A protein has these predicted regions:
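N-terminal cofactor/phosphate-binding cores enriched in small/glycine residues
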Residues: 37, 41, 45-50, 77, ...
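Membrane-embedded alpha-helical bundles that constitute the cytochrome b-like, heme-associated redox core
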Residues: 7-202
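Compositionally biased, low-complexity flexible segments
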Residues: 2-5
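Primarily the internal scaffold of c-type cytochrome electron-transfer domains
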Residues: 135, 167-178, 191-224, 240-275, ...
Length: 529
């Protein structure tokens, strides 16, 4: 019609209505993504700074505050997940046909990098019931992706924005300064107090524990709930806990009938002779750590049948909280500490307990340093209890040697230190764990490839122990437990014969060495080997 808008010529393409790549609603979502990402940058600079400080100094600076900020990292990452993916999809849909193909291509690369960053974070978080990755190699790859991809994201974002509105560099610089000052200030403060491992406890605490040689890191007692916390450990280490339940370590305390009889008699005699139970402490440093370090052992009225701690045995924490072996004397000459747990470890609230588990699964390094120290891989650690002497305070007589597995191991050829080591075995075994804690297949958290093929954990049955304990303690599976010990002991005894003397006397004719010529022994005659 006259006066109306001009119509396009017939056959010409209709003009599309301009749709901005980032509209008003999408701009609000982008602002939320930027805000969350900015907070994550500040938090990440601090977390990486602590890791770098630890790598440079060899010290441990992670603590409760660090774990809280790591929890904040997980929360911010979870909050960023949907907005980032949602904005990326919407922005892609709006901008996919833009004529600036270079900006579109860089945008695709940027969105891919963001997805990689978020996916690696999900893999590392190991959400219960959703995605739990235990393979150490996969986690290592995911960690490096999570650390390096943010650099690519920042670079690609700058390239992508060069095709659009002018970048406000001033805002970025200000936020970088804030991140550096915040993280740097916290690092300076945190660097003043590294976590101290492998330290001997104060001598002042001996008065609570002598004649046992054990000490605590503070010189005081440790709450029973801290030491007797196996159910907490079993949540992530079920296979390890199952093997431990069948071990002699589980039945080390008043739940072991022969030990119960022995320690009752020792406590009775000590009380009658000395007026207190101090002499009986000699047993408790190795056999009754929960009762002992919580201060209950000295109670003459301690109920060794019905008190829950009496049946605790040698618990997970009782071994793994040991932080120092004070000397090779044995008799529990070690220092044990109250371990620093992740936040909410003892919470009765299910939600907070779940948060605690997620923190450990997502960031297990500090947990591992706390509960698995280098000393746990040494024969001196085992020797702290597998080497015994009877002190005068106990027997009222004199110092006497008791069972001593530690010295006999060192004097044997197996250790590589004994005189027989020059010919047997072909390869020495440097520590007790090499034989008594062989790897067993498992998918527990903490399992690793000992042979390069199968995930495995160290066996906490400790085969070769007393085979009678399981039956005496009433363990339903005792026949199978005994068989496992027997299988371990099959063929382990070796008797080396260097020569024989005829007549069975010391001055008889000697035939030696027995190789390569082997003498023929006559049945019925006597020989001295």
């Amino acid at each position: 019609p006259a006066g109306g808008p001009a119509m396009p010529p017939a056959g010409s393409p209709a003009k599309r209505r301009y749709v901005p790549a980032v509209g008003p609603r999408l701009a609000k979502l982008l602002f939320a993504v930027f805000g969350l990402f900015a907070l994550l940058v500040v938090d990440s600079v601090y977390l990486l700074g602590v890791r770098g400080l630890e790598a440079a100094t060899g010290q441990t600076y992670q603590n409760w505050f660090y774990l809280i900020l790591f929890l904040l990292h997980l929360v911010l990452g979870a909050l960023l997940l949907l907005p980032a993916v949602g904005f990326g999809c919407a922005h892609w849909w709006r901008a996919r046909s833009r004529p600036n193909r270079r900006a579109v291509a860089v945008g695709y690369a940027l969105f891919t990098a963001v997805l990689l960053l978020l996916a690696s974070g999900v893999v590392l978080t190991r959400l219960e019931g959703i995605l739990v990755v235990k393979d150490p190699a996969v986690r290592a790859i995911a960690w490096w992706v999570h650390v390096l991809v943010p650099v690519a994201v920042a670079w690609l974002f700058v390239l992508h924005r060069l095709a659009g509105k002018r970048i406000r560099w001033r805002v970025g610089r200000r936020w970088a300064v804030v991140a550096a000052l915040f993280a740097g200030g916290l690092l300076v403060v945190q660097a003043q107090d590294p976590r101290r491992w492998n330290m001997s406890g104060p001598a002042s605490g001996e008065r609570y524990f002598l004649p046992s040689l054990a000490r605590t890191s503070t010189g005081g007692f440790i709450p029973a709930r801290v030491l007797d916390n196996n159910a907490y450990c079993a949540e992530c280490h079920a296979d390890t806990h199952k093997r431990w339940q069948k071990s002699a370590h589980r039945f080390s305390s008043f739940n072991n009938p022969p030990y119960l009889f022995s320690v009752r008699e020792t406590r009775k005699v000590a009380l009658e002779r000395d007026g207190d139970l101090q002499a009986a402490r000699f047993c408790a440093g190795c056999h009754d750590p929960v009762v002992f370090f919580s201060g209950r052992f000295d109670d003459p009225k301690f109920d060794d049948v019905n008190d829950p701690t009496a049946k605790a045995g040698l618990t997970c924490t009782a071994c793994h909280a040991i932080t120092h072996v004070n000397s090779p004397r044995g008799n529990s000459d070690y220092t044990i500490e109250e371990p620093q747990h992740y936040p909410f470890a003892f919470s009765g609230n299910k939600a907070l307990a779940w948060v605690n588990r997620q923190l450990i699964k997502a960031k297990p390094e500090f947990h591992k340093k706390t509960f698995l120290k280098p000393l746990h891989r040494t024969p001196e650690f085992c020797g702290a209890c597998h080497k015994v002497h009877l002190p005068q305070q106990l027997n009222g007589y004199k110092w006497l040697r008791g069972q001593n597995h530690y010295d006999s191991f060192l004097l044997s050829g197996v250790s590589g230190h004994g005189v027989a080591a020059f010919y047997y075995p072909e390869k020495a075994e440097a520590n007790c764990n090499g034989c008594h804690m062989k790897p067993v297949p498992s998918t527990d958290f903490g399992a690793k490839y000992h042979d390069g093929k199968t995930l495995a954990i160290r066996d906490h049955l400790f085969p070769s122990a007393n085979t009678a304990i399981a039956k005496l303690a009433g363990e339903p599976e005792w026949p199978e437990i005994v068989k496992e010990h027997e299988r371990f002991n099959d063929g382990v005894v070796r008797v080396d014969l260097f020569g024989v003397k005829e007549g069975g006397t010391i001055d008889g004719p000697l035939t030696a060495p027995l190789r390569p010529r082997v003498p023929t022994l006559v049945p019925g005659r006597s020989y001295l080997l």
